[in-house]
Amino acid sequence: MSKKINQVLGFLIPILLFIPYIFFSPIKFNYTGLINDTDAKLLSSFCILPSMLFLTYLFYNKKPVYIKQKKWLIYNLFLLVLMLMTFFTPYNKSEPVTSNIHLFFGVISFYIMILEYIAIFYLDSHNRNIICILCLLDFIYITTCMSVNGLSEWIFITIISISLITKKN
């Protein structure tokens, strides 16, 4: 029963996170401006695509993504909540309170995400190469955009990668 729930979560979370990126204008949420740039959108899509292909590969090869322990599920859900808080809190220089909240959630999500990448890299040798590729894509993304201003957008991309790669039995 729990495997089925985790399979569904592993499939739905990335899709639910991808929907706002497609259908809503970033201007409505008052983004920092990174994702409003057309080149950044194309680069973001390039970074998201390998994660989506990896998800498709796992499901077609009947190797579903599932979470081994309840702690891992809680950890991922906590990271998801932090990322969503970053995603939906506006960053506006004229409103320092909301800007600080946005940066607070963004920085916490960033450090938790890095710890999760490290944990998966050392604990799961099966996904080690995939982690390296996704980290490289994230590095290319942030260095090409030459800015950490769009931290929430960057976390949005990396959280999709993280939610696709979980521990296996």
Question: Model-found features: residue ranges?
Answer:
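N-terminal topogenic module of multi-pass integral membrane proteins
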Residues: 1-67
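Juxtamembrane "helix-exit" motif on the non-cytosolic side of transmembrane helices
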Residues: 28-30, 60-64, 87-96, 140-148
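Terminal transmembrane helical module of multi-pass membrane proteins
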Residues: 124-169
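Membrane-interfacial loop-to-transmembrane alpha-helix junctions, especially the N-terminal start
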Residues: 4-12, 65-79, 124-134
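Hydrophobic cores of alpha-helical transmembrane segments in multi-pass inner/ER membrane proteins
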Residues: 11-17, 44-58, 108-120, 156-169
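Membrane-helix interface and helix-disruption motif detector
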Residues: 33-42, 91-106, 144-154
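Membrane-proximal helix-loop-helix units in multi-pass membrane proteins
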Residues: 75-132
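Aromatic-anchored segments of alpha-helical transmembrane domains
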Residues: 16-22, 79-88, 136-146
